């Protein structure tokens, strides 16, 4: 009897841990979504800025800088999208473990 209570308590602690971890991952995913959106806006801003800079301004270097900045922002968007995919996979695994805990009862 005592052993089953300990196991039941441990199962509850595991479930609470998984639930909190799942919520943490959801918050992190939402944060990454905001970062993706922000960086996509920056990409658009740089595209618009690039339209206003002309060659007769003799600032060809600015175009190179803007291109590099744009690439950096695009890379960030890709990195955040990859991270979101990893978080989503981890959330699915946690949901599966939580379902296993629930079915033990």
UniProtKB/Swiss-Prot annotation:
What's the domain of life for this entry? Bacteria
Pfam families registered for this protein in UniProt = DUF496
Q: Which gene holds the coding sequence for this protein?
A: tmaR
Q: Where in the cell is it found?
A: Cytoplasm
Name the family the entry cites. Answer: Belongs to the pole-localizer TmaR family.
Coiled-coil ranges per the record?
A: 70-104
This chain belongs to which protein, by name?
Pole-localizer protein TmaR
Q: What is its main location?
A: cytoplasm
Keyword check for Cell inner membrane: no
* Keyword field contains Cytoplasm: yes
InterPro entries hit by this protein = DUF496
Question: What is the scientific name of the source organism?
Answer: Glaesserella parasuis serovar 5 (strain SH0165) (Haemophilus parasuis)
Q: Function of this protein?
A: Pole-localizer protein involved in the regulation of several cellular processes.
What is one GO cellular-component annotation here? Answer: cytosol
User: Keywords for this entry?
Assistant: Coiled coil, Cytoplasm
């Amino acid at each position: 009897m005592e052993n089953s209570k300990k196991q039941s308590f441990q199962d509850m602690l595991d479930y609470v841990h998984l639930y909190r971890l799942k919520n943490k991952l959801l918050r992190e995913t939402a944060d990454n979504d905001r970062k993706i959106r922000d960086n996509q806006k920056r990409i658009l801003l740089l595209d618009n800025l690039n339209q206003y800079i002309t060659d007769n301004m003799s600032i060809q270097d600015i175009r190179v800088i803007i291109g590099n900045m744009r690439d950096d922002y695009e890379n960030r968007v890709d990195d955040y999208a990859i991270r979101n995919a990893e978080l989503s996979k981890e959330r699915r695994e946690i949901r599966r473990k939580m379902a296993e805990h629930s079915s033990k009862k």
